[in-house]
UniProtKB/Swiss-Prot annotation:
This is Probable glycine dehydrogenase (decarboxylating) subunit 2. Gene3D superfamilies: 6.20.440.10, Aspartate Aminotransferase, domain 1, Type I PLP-dependent aspartate aminotransferase-like (Major domain). GO terms for biological process: glycine decarboxylation via glycine cleavage system. Belongs to the GcvP family. C-terminal subunit subfamily. Its EC number is 1.4.4.2. HAMAP family: GcvPB. It comes from the Bacteria. The glycine cleavage system is composed of four proteins: P, T, L and H. In this organism, the P 'protein' is a heterodimer of two subunits. It catalyses: N(6)-[(R)-lipoyl]-L-lysyl-[glycine-cleavage complex H protein] + glycine + H(+) = N(6)-[(R)-S(8)-aminomethyldihydrolipoyl]-L-lysyl-[glycine-cleavage complex H protein] + CO2. It holds the Pfam family Aminotran_5. It comes from Thioalkalivibrio sulfidiphilus (strain HL-EbGR7). One of its GO terms (molecular function) is glycine dehydrogenase (decarboxylating) activity. InterPro entries: Aminotrans_V_dom, GcvPB, GDC-P_C, GDC_P, PyrdxlP-dep_Trfase, PyrdxlP-dep_Trfase_major, PyrdxlP-dep_Trfase_small. The modification N6-(pyridoxal phosphate)lysine is found at K265.
Length: 496
């Protein structure tokens, strides 16, 4: 039930003082409302109960296991939140001069340096992108700016493997490139012959995730980097899966020229629900002139923002100020808590947990998409045979998992694996939690074989069960209040 449906005329949390004409006398007539604002009217208790009930329906990492593949739903240490909310940080205004922001700027400079060190991007890091997708855009925009500066306008193509993150082709297109898809071979690696055939004078670069979304490490990455560079292109690294190699392997050492990092994933800042995010970008020396601004510089013992005057070839600003400051501070605290010795342990335990769950699920009878490969931080189970034999699909299994108080893994992604579940346990989960998840999956598999209708009817314990997904897509209702969309159409004289 929406809060508007709980509204009762005349009910309110506080008494409203009568409006005096003198209060609005200076307000032009065209800005004065002719009718009451269409806001819900409830008592304070009704409002508190409404939102408390909604919060109790939420699924979060604070309450249950969240193995959502390629999303790195790890626990966010509370110390990161507490320190990021110190009064000195909260009270700083974005327009405050550098001289009044030395503590904040020092943290941002150190964060840039730590990210540069752990990724091997020697040209530097910019923290200004406010989401992973914006970081992607910044990365490809820098590739474009690099070629444009060299007047190499023939380079109109970006190569994207078919196992890439779904946003990669969209990003390349937004930057004005034509996308060429590169197939994956049977072992989960980039098809090298197809790559060689695609490279040429029109190649601007290639977008890669390593480990890939298939949950395997691209074993011939150095050869790929050499081939792309020999063809005159650049390598973009999608940092979606950086958690698997943190402190172990550096993208810069693999030959990448630009990387975006999801600080809201790998570096444990809260995410989900649309934000806030942080998509910091790191570059090699050749792309440093094109970095998005502002970037924090250290001069002696003082810190300042570098602007257009310092980087005249910059692709420009991507946020009004300097990125999501609160998210960046949380990532900074997280990295300081881990230290140089702690970062490799993130990769070690995330891959250990993934391989443990993968091995146990295989023992329980689940089919792996790439049985001959070790998992990195995530892996893929394919239910194509189960669906053929029982008509129980990956979506059915995902729905049934909700009844066991586990969030479903990512379903039907990546697209090239049929009936797939992409499972990422992260490094912060205990063996007991992982064992419980495995047993739940095994029980669902047995149900699918003996009582398929039970699985196909799930979930049974949720406030909402199965939705009419076709109707939801065709009769979209995302208005801010019931009937609002129709009212606005009528007011503007538009027709459906």
């Amino acid at each position: 039930m929406l809060i508007f449906e709980r509204s009762r005329p005349g009910r309110g949390a506080t008494a409203q003082a009568p409006l005096r004409e003198a209060t609005v006398s200076g307000l032009p007539e065209r800005f004065r409302r002719g009718t009451r604002a269409p806001l819900p009217e409830l008592s304070e208790l009704d409002v508190v109960r409404h939102y408390t009930r909604l919060s109790q329906k939420n699924f979060s990492i604070d309450t249950q296991f969240y193995p959502l593949g390629s999303c790195t739903m790890k626990y966010n240490p509370r110390a990161c939140n507490s320190l990021a909310m110190l009064p000195g940080f909260l009270g700083r205004h974005p327009h405050a001069p550098d001289t009044h922001s030395q503590g904040f700027l020092a943290c941002m400079f150190e964060l840039q340096e730590m990210l540069r060190d752990v990724t091997g991007m020697k040209g530097g890091v910019s923290l200004t992108p406010m989401a992973g997708a914006q970081g992607e855009f910044a990365g490809v925009a820098m590739i474009r700016a690099y070629h444009d500066a060299r007047k190499d306008t023939a380079r109109t193509e970006i190569l994207v493997p078919d196992a890439a993150h779904g946003t990669n082709p969209a990003t390349a297109t937004m930057c004005g490139y034509t996308v060429k898809e590169i197939p994956t071979d049977d072992s989960g690696d980039v098809d090298m012959e197809a790559l060689k055939a695609a490279l040429g004078p029109h190649t601007a670069g290639i977008m890669l995730t390593n480990p890939s979304t298939l949950g395997v490490f691209e074993r011939r990455i150095k050869e790929i980097a050499d081939l792309v560079h020999q063809a005159g292109g650049l390598l973009y690294y999608d940092g979606a899966n950086l958690n698997a190699i943190l402190g172990k392997v550096r993208p810069g050492d693999m030959g990448f020229d630009v990387i975006h990092m999801n600080l809201h994933k790998t570096f444990s800042t809260p995410h989900g629900g649309g934000g806030p995010g942080a998509g910091a970008v790191g570059v090699s020396e050749r792309l440093r002139p094109f970095m998005p601004i502002p970037v924090v510089a250290k001069e002696g013992e003082r810190y300042r923002f570098m602007t257009e005057k310092d980087l005249p070839q910059s692709i420009g600003r991507l946020s009004a100020f300097a990125g999501n400051a609160g998210v960046l501070l949380r990532a900074y605290v997280y990295m300081r808590m881990l230290g140089r010795a702690g970062m490799p342990r993130v990769a070690e335990f995330s891959t250990l947990n993934a391989n443990y769950v993968m091995a146990r699920l295989r023992e329980k009878g689940f089919e792996l998409a790439f049985p001959g490969r070790r998992a990195t931080h995530e892996f893929i189970v394919t239910l194509k045979r189960l669906a053929k034999d029982t008509e129980v699909t990956a979506m059915d299994v995902a729905k049934r998992l909700l009844d066991f108080n586990y969030h479903a893994p990512t379903t039907y992604f990546p697209l090239l694996v049929p009936e797939c579940l992409l499972i990422e346990p992260t490094e912060t989960e205990s063996k007991e939690t992982l064992d419980g998840f495995v047993e739940a999956m095994a029980e669902i598999l047995e149900e699918a074989r003996t009582s398929p209708d039970k699985v196909k009817g799930a979930p049974y314990t949720q406030p909402n069960r199965r939705f009419d997904e076709v109707r939801a897509a065709r009769e979209l209702d995302v208005a801010w209040r019931p009937g609002a969309a129709l009212d606005e159409v009528a007011e503007q004289g538009r027709t459906d």
